[in-house]
């Protein structure tokens, strides 16, 4: 999941999610079932047939998350998924990622937003100059 959702412009929300399953050769009935389940998870059922340019930034991020989950990854990598979102939408996206984590998927998120780190009290690994500068099981963000 990237800071700028890389959605397929000529495909609607449903098709953007289903695409990840199509390229893996998933049977059509399974594509339909899984895509609908993912639309439920990210709360985009009402936007299933909207195109990326008809979605807000937060909605686009949720499509990107759903598409990333389509093939049941063990780990979900998120690079600044809230970077271009307002604080309220950021909270919604982080809450969705926490829900995904509680369901069993490891979520690794890079962020510069100290409020996200401090509010969640999750494991924090700080990188400086390409090396681990800190690794705390329930750390908080410290400005240095």
Residues of each region from the PLM?
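Conserved ABC ATPase signature
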Residues: 51-55, 59
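ABC nucleotide-binding domain "signature" region
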Residues: 30-42
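Helix N-cap at the start of a conserved alpha-helix in ABC-type nucleotide-binding domains
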Residues: 87-89
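Short coil-to-helix segment of the ABC ATPase nucleotide-binding domain corresponding to the Q-loop/switch region
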Residues: 11-18
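A short, proline-enriched helix->beta-strand linker immediately N-terminal to the Walker B motif
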Residues: 70-74
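Hydrophobic anchor residue at the start of the ABC signature
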Residues: 65
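Catalytic Walker B motif of ABC-type/P-loop ATPase nucleotide-binding domains
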Residues: 76-79
